[in-house]
């Protein structure tokens, strides 16, 4: 590659005694696996730099599946994440690692991710930012569901009616109830990415769970386990 690339480290793991293997999301090259040689040495100038949620300029070499880092510098300080918000940000990273193929550019998704992190850093409630990012991710993965029109008739969604979701096809008017049933009001809120009530947020979360399941597979997300203690404490 030529020049510096805007990146975020999504995840890292030790490699040998002195190095790190990085899962990186880059603006123009998508997700990459990059070896950072010597990053774990005590005197490494990269110590503390290759962290999630820190905007970075990076440069690397290599044409295979594993690149080699040649330069990294912070663009700015890490976006501030604490507690429940931090767990939410780790969730975004884990989803990207799970669903994105290596070396596939997603420049618009990169900006969606950056905007989601900025929104999380200022949020009291992370749920709206998470739902908006999940919906953006589904769009970039080619999951083109129309929330504004009935899949059966093509008629506009009526906010007073009920609709049943057929996976990969869309929503049809229905009197059914259950996990795959949504009100027109909920669908219009999802379409607008505007969640003004808890009911609309819960519906958006239910939909994104359904839609992302084929991409995430059956293995549980580790970041979701971090939410369990907080949920239990709320109930006490």
Swiss-Prot record:
GO terms for biological process: DNA recombination; double-strand break repair. Gene3D superfamilies: Nucleic acid-binding proteins, Recombination protein O, C-terminal domain. The keyword DNA damage applies. Transmembrane segments: none annotated. One of its GO terms (cellular component) is bacterial nucleoid. Keywords: DNA damage, DNA recombination, DNA repair. InterPro entries: ARFGAP/RecO, DNA_rep/recomb_RecO_N, NA-bd_OB-fold, RecO, RecO_C. Pfam families: RecO_C, RecO_N. Coiled coil: none annotated. Involved in DNA repair and RecF pathway recombination. Belongs to the RecO family. This is DNA repair protein RecO. It comes from Photobacterium profundum (strain SS9).
